[in-house]
Curated annotation (Swiss-Prot):
Gene Ontology biological process terms, A to Z: tRNA wobble cytosine modification
Major localization class: cytoplasm
Gene responsible for this protein: tiaS
Protein's organism: Caldivirga maquilingensis (strain ATCC 700844 / DSM 13496 / JCM 10307 / IC-167)
Protein name (record): tRNA(Ile2) 2-agmatinylcytidine synthetase TiaS
Origin: domain of life: Archaea
Catalytic activity of the protein: cytidine(34) in tRNA(Ile2) + agmatine + ATP + H2O = 2-agmatinylcytidine(34) in tRNA(Ile2) + AMP + 2 phosphate + 2 H(+)
GO molecular function, one term: ligase activity, forming carbon-nitrogen bonds
UniProt similarity note: Belongs to the TiaS family.
Secreted as UniProt keyword: no
Alphabetized UniProt keyword annotations: ATP-binding, Cytoplasm, Ligase, Nucleotide-binding, tRNA processing
Residue ranges the record marks as coiled coil: none
EC top class, as a word: ligase
Protein role: ATP-dependent agmatine transferase that catalyzes the formation of 2-agmatinylcytidine (agm2C) at the wobble position (C34) of tRNA(Ile2), converting the codon specificity from AUG to AUA.
Amino acid sequence: MITWVGIDDTDTYDKGCTTYVMYNMLKEFLKTKGEWRIITYPRLIRLNPNVPFKTRGNAAVSVGLNVDDPREALELAEWAVDAYSHKIGKTSPGIVVSISNNEHWIYWKALSDVIPLNAAVKWMSKLGVIYRGGRGVIGALASVMADLSQDSTLELLAYSESTPKPSIPIDLVKKLNDSTTPLTFENVSGDYVLIQPHGNDPVIFGIRGDSPYHIIHFASMLINEVDVEPRWLIYLTNQATGHHLNSIMNKPYTTGYVEGSVNEVRLVQGGNIEIRVNSTHVFSYRHYGFKSIDKATYLIAYGGFKPGVNSLDLYMEGGVALMLNNIVKNPRCPRCGSNLESTGRVGLLKCPKCGLITGLPRLMNYTSEFTLEEPREAEVRHLHKPTARIGLEGLVNVFNRPSLWII
């Protein structure tokens, strides 16, 4: 019987990793079960990035297992959470076990809205889903019900419990990035390595991409260089898909969209920019590196809505800035060809060379340009879809799961 297991909220803001709980759960499962009993890749699902309460990575994990009884999967998940989670502070681990995973509307709602715990419990009771724990069941349920049929990406996460974390050489990362792009992405930004987290967790690096073979090659070269025991797991993810933009809610703590003429632009604390578009205040953080929004005359922006003083404020994640410039020129003299000048009287122009006075209209020249506003690679949120991925949607589905998906 195929049974889906979801886990969330097992880490704190400074320790632990929910993906490591899944890694150890699968390694334990494989001690007594064949690999064929694990249905495709485990899944790493990022949730609504705008909710005020979320785990450090704001992600839940899930996997499909072929077991004789769903209680077997539940017991395995409970063991892994007890052994590898950090239940301190605001951590509220949750486990979900379901024999179906096709209630995709739950996934889309978890990406775009705020789901109360009592609503999730009501849905699970109605669907016959087994659950244990606290607030983490919301993300766990969303991960189980994730819809990755149209687009998904992969991430290989390598683990080590040794401290300190090994140093990853920037030159090697750049070389591997150049040889695997565009089938891997978000590896490096200038001289800054993006693949290594700096928190107190067992993840030593994560390689994202659309081809399992390219990310395995990338990881193998790094493992050889940093000289640690190879331990990794490849996840199927919704990262870099832009799934959170599929539903625009325009209410607090949801993804929002604003379009209109720019009425005011001003610098606020920290060098950030506040733009008034119609009646909405749009905020752009300086470190995002948006290029031209301070010059925009018309702006299309998307991001997260948060309550403002009198209305909703949009915190910009990306968009399009349009710059319109109106250039007014005096025409040339129809008699001698010199540039006409103003006479100081409305509507009249005078030629400084031949003295002709004329009522010829001034020439209006319109110029326009637009820029696609994307954050710097080092500031990209997990769900943000980079332009480099356009045209690669669904490519993951072309490849079979390689034998080295877990080691």
